[in-house]
């Protein structure tokens, strides 16, 4: 059985590098009819926070990477939170001590004063001493493993000193816990970032000392910023929370992240179908550059072309994570999305572009007021529009278009002035979705209501007699 895992530490929000790792693990499990496990590695007690754990779980749910087992999906290999597995780790620490493959190291004022397997009572629970457990490294070993991405990797233990596996606070270190967890959870493939290669020899030493069978390893290439240094906040925002709040589509994010290290043979695709083609052999060894512009373009393409039902779902979910309130009928919102999405790149832009559809009252742009509302012909155009729209019996796009052309043909002012006057009166601004579509979306009664409101507002202005 193929079993892979994504094991974030809850010391911050999920970031693009972590999500790429989770995605490739998800791809591999999905393709091979395996299991994808989410494990929380929270043994860094000072930095780990429950709020970050909750955020990671929520962000995984938001992007759509379902896992089979985890802290909120118990399975037979739990617990799935490392802080709940301390007794398990202690058992294996004791085993290594008993077999003299590890030993106690006692320091006082940073000076080693005792090392051995039989810890004297005077060192126990005495704050004057710092007691850790170290793993004993035999310096004449050659460590070699086959990496599914990079081929054979070799290490010489002469470059590895004895290393701590249990801290003085009684909490085991990462390189120890990850071995115990991966073995007991029957992880078959460890797919993780290239930055973990240096940890692998220490982990293999622990595997061998405990007579555990090794999993297969695959180390993914680093993600770099445009200056070719490891991607970090100094290059720009990297948290999934940020991209969610900015209105990026989950499907677009996963589409783009798929391209960072894997040759997918196309630029735009649905990740829920692409897993069938995933192959670790096609994962590059070379680092990938995170290109914010390309991510935005990818999002734009998905926003324009994905099924309206999916975009609508993403739009309403986006609103829940912001202060935006959208409680309109689904059919109404879908019409707005359809009319707007070709002109924006994100859901946030979509809302800003179309937000006056969602409210009954709004402020008019200053440019609209100065260029149109203050003109002497404004009142004539609006009154004619109210009258003509009221006369339409069958309210459809063709009839609305013909009606507006009839108003323009009255020669009250130029055609552009007529259309922009109506547009601004309906939506308060001069750049909106198509005018005919906007009138249909708002409906006859709401359109007339808004035109009357604009007329009332214009009566409070000083008229500019210049044409």
From Swiss-Prot:
InterPro entries: aa-tRNA-synth_I_cd-bd, aa-tRNA-synth_I_codon-bd_sub2, aa-tRNA-synth_I_CS, aa_tRNA-synth_I_cd-bd_sf, Glu-tRNA-ligase_bac/mito, Glu-tRNA-synth_I_codon-bd_sub1, Glu/Gln-tRNA-synth, Glu/Gln-tRNA-synth_Ib_cat-dom
Family, similarity comment: Belongs to the class-I aminoacyl-tRNA synthetase family. Glutamate--tRNA ligase type 1 subfamily.
Name listed for the protein in its UniProt record: Glutamate--tRNA ligase 1
PANTHER family (UniProt xref): GLUTAMATE--TRNA LIGASE, GLUTAMATE--TRNA LIGASE, MITOCHONDRIAL-RELATED
Gene assigned in the entry: gltX1
Intervals of motif 'HIGH' region: 8-18
Described purpose of this protein according to its UniProt entry: Catalyzes the attachment of glutamate to tRNA(Glu) in a two-step reaction: glutamate is first activated by ATP to form Glu-AMP and then transferred to the acceptor end of tRNA(Glu).
GO cellular component, one term: cytosol
Keyword presence, Cytoplasm: yes
Residue window of motif 'KMSKS' region: 230-234
Cellular location(s): Cytoplasm
Pfam families per record: Anticodon_2, tRNA-synt_1c
Keyword annotations from UniProtKB, A to Z: Aminoacyl-tRNA synthetase, ATP-binding, Cytoplasm, Ligase, Nucleotide-binding, Protein biosynthesis
GO biological process terms on file: glutamyl-tRNA aminoacylation
Subunit structure: Monomer.
GO molecular function, one term: glutamate-tRNA ligase activity
Catalytic activity: tRNA(Glu) + L-glutamate + ATP = L-glutamyl-tRNA(Glu) + AMP + diphosphate
Chief site of localization: cytoplasm
Annotated residues for binding of ATP: 233
EC number of this enzyme: 6.1.1.17
Domain of life of the native organism: Bacteria
Organism placement in taxonomy: Bacteria, Thermotogati, Thermotogota, Thermotogae, Petrotogales
Organism this protein belongs to: Petrotoga mobilis (strain DSM 10674 / SJ95)
């Amino acid at each position: 059985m193929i079993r892979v895992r994504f094991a974030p530490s809850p010391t911050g929000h999920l970031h693009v590098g972590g999500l790429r790792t989770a995605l490739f693990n998800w791809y591999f499990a999905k393709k091979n009819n395996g299991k994808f496990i989410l494990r929380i590695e929270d043994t860094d007690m000072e930095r780990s926070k429950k709020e970050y754990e909750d955020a990671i779980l929520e962000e995984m749910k938001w992007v759509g990477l379902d896992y089979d087992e985890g802290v909120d999906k118990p399975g037979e290999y739990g617990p799935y939170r490392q802080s709940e597995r301390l007794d398990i780790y202690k058992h294996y620490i004791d085993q290594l001590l008993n077999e003299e493959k590890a030993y106690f190291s006692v320091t006082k004022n940073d000076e080693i004063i005792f090392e051995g397997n039989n810890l004297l009572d005077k060192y126990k629970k005495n704050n004057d001493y710092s007691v850790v457990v170290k793993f004993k490294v035999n310096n004449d070993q050659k460590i070699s493993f086959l990496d599914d991405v990079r081929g054979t990797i070799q290490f010489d233990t002469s470059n590895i000193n004895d290393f701590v596996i249990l801290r003085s606070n009684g909490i085991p270190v990462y390189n120890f816990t990850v071995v115990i967890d991966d073995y007991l959870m029957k992880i078959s493939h460890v797919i993780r970032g290239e930055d973990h290669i240096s940890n692998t020899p220490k982990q293999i030493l622990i595997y061998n000392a405990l007579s555990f069978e090794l999993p297969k390893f695959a180390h993914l290439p680093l993600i770099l910023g445009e200056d070719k240094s490891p991607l970090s906040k100094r290059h720009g925002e990297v948290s999934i929370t940020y991209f969610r709040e900015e209105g990026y589509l989950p499907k677009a994010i996963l589409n783009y992240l798929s391209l960072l290290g894997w040759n997918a043979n196309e630029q735009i695709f649905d990740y829920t179908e692409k897993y069938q083609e995933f192959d670790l052999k096609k994962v590059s060894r070379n680092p990938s550059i995170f290109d914010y512009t390309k991510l935005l373009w990818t999002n734009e393409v998905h926003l324009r072309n994905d099924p309206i039902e999916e975009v609508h779902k993403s739009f309403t979910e986006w609103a829940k994570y912001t202060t935006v309130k959208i409680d309109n009928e689904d059919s109404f919102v879908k019409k707005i999305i359809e009319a707007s999405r070709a002109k924006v790149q994100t859901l946030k832009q979509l809302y800003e572009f179309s937000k006056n559809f969602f409210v009954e009252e709004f402020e008019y742009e200053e440019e609209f007021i100065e260029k149109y509302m203050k003109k002497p012909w404004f009142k004539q155009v609006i009154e004619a529009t109210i009258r003509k729209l009221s006369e339409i019996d069958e309210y459809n796009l063709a009839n609305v278009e013909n009606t507006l052309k009839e108003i323009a043909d009255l020669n009250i002012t130029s055609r552009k002035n007529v259309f922009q006057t109506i547009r601004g009166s309906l939506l308060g601004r001069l750049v909106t979705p198509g005018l005919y579509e906007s009138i249909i979306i708002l409906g006859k009664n709401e359109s007339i209501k808004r035109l009357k409101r604009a007329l009332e507002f214009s009566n409070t202005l000083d008229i500019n007699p210049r044409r």
